[in-house]
Amino acid sequence: MANVDDVHTKPIPAFYCCYLLRSTVRQTSLYIGSTPHPSRRLAQHNGVSRGGARKTANDKRPWEMVLIVEGFMSRTAALQFDTIYTTWAWQKPGKSRHLGDDDNTESAREKGKTRPRGPARSLKGHLENLHALLRSTYFSGLPLRVRFFADDVHQLWRVWSDRIDGFIPEHIKVIPDGSCFENRQPGIEYLRVGSVEHIQVDYSKIHSYLEKTTFQLDDPEDLQCKVCQAPVVPKEELVLVCPQTRCYCVSHLLCLSARFLDSTKDRGRLIPISGKCPGCHKTIQWSLMMQELSFRTRGAKELQAILRKKKRGDCRVKDVPEKDTDDVGTVTAECCDFPESVGGSIEGPGDASDESTHDDVRLDDDWYESLGIESDHEIADWSESHPAMPTRVEIVIEDSDCDNTG
């Protein structure tokens, strides 16, 4: 495990999830793990690439990833959540203090039945324990999503959910994806990705957001906190910027946090899930702002590399007068004025084959804190009005080593 001081100086990872595998050869064989890169990890389990786990080898292959739980926040975001431990708790629920009597309801059990919770070997047992984890006092406050890729597993989940008295918090979304029957309920369709391979696991979704905040805070003169009206000093204070494209609202972290918490119905909550921006009054996700803040304050070299790469991309598409043939295809020095000491592109997971790796800047491989997923509404808004160049960020994070097959 990484040194605590080192881990807490790294940006929040772009993606981290827990997953459930099922053997397509022996469907009673299940495996639970955690990873920052689901498609890469699935390929490892199936022997396509090196890695994987001993209990997912040979006669039980190929495996399918039937569901993932995504949206984990880092400890630096104050949610006190360790993704490795969460996986362990899901695998060994009988030994987890989070699956005791502190579920989110007083009678969160299957109607008409009471029995001690033992090791979950069946698919139904794993789903029961996952449901209980999401209802528990500790985990119900996290901005999580449960994404199903197999329709039969999703249907079993729905049947179990209908039979139990306990309810998962409204902010925890259940997304039928992959082969699941398309669910037309509002707010779900735009979340579908289609397959494990299409899950976005890098920082590219927040590149334009990072660019916006960097340039907005570069000249802090006359900037004021929208909540307390006091001046903001980005170099000395933790400052948040609204992720909405056309909103330039700036707030102190503590001021905005207090405002969001004051507006929630859950008076016992310590960390916000979301809230309305005091500037544009649109709902924004706390986890998205925390990811941007951590990258801006802890990943200075990586941030400058993103900006430099984006600047180069803008230079390539810069209009050149047709009659001035001597300048066609050239890029002026003034157009790309970033310091030469700044690194270049940042690779994404599995993209090490890129030819232009001589100036890449990479994050260290000794950190694995988890991240809450970004708001897709906000990301879609950014993508339409600020098309980003295909820069990539590599996150080298250890996968879970815990084996649990039935």
From Swiss-Prot:
It is found in: Nucleus. It holds the Pfam family SLX1_C. GO terms for molecular function: 5'-flap endonuclease activity; crossover junction DNA endonuclease activity; zinc ion binding. A zinc finger (SLX1-type) spans 225-280. GO terms for cellular component: Slx1-Slx4 complex. Residues 14-97 form the GIY-YIG domain. It is an enzyme of class 3 (hydrolase). Residues 98-113 have a biased composition (Basic and acidic residues). Keywords: DNA damage, DNA recombination, DNA repair, Endonuclease, Hydrolase, Metal-binding, Nuclease, Nucleus, Zinc, Zinc-finger. Residues 32-57, 93-122, 341-361 are annotated as: Disordered. Its EC number is 3.1.-.-. Its cofactor is a divalent metal cation. It comes from the Eukaryota. GO terms for biological process: double-strand break repair via homologous recombination. Belongs to the SLX1 family. HAMAP family: Endonuc_su_Slx1. Forms a heterodimer with slx4. Catalytic subunit of the slx1-slx4 structure-specific endonuclease that resolves DNA secondary structures generated during DNA repair and recombination. Has endonuclease activity towards branched DNA substrates, introducing single-strand cuts in duplex DNA close to junctions with ss-DNA. PANTHER family: STRUCTURE-SPECIFIC ENDONUCLEASE SUBUNIT SLX1 (PTHR20208:SF10). This is Structure-specific endonuclease subunit slx1. It comes from Aspergillus oryzae (strain ATCC 42149 / RIB 40).
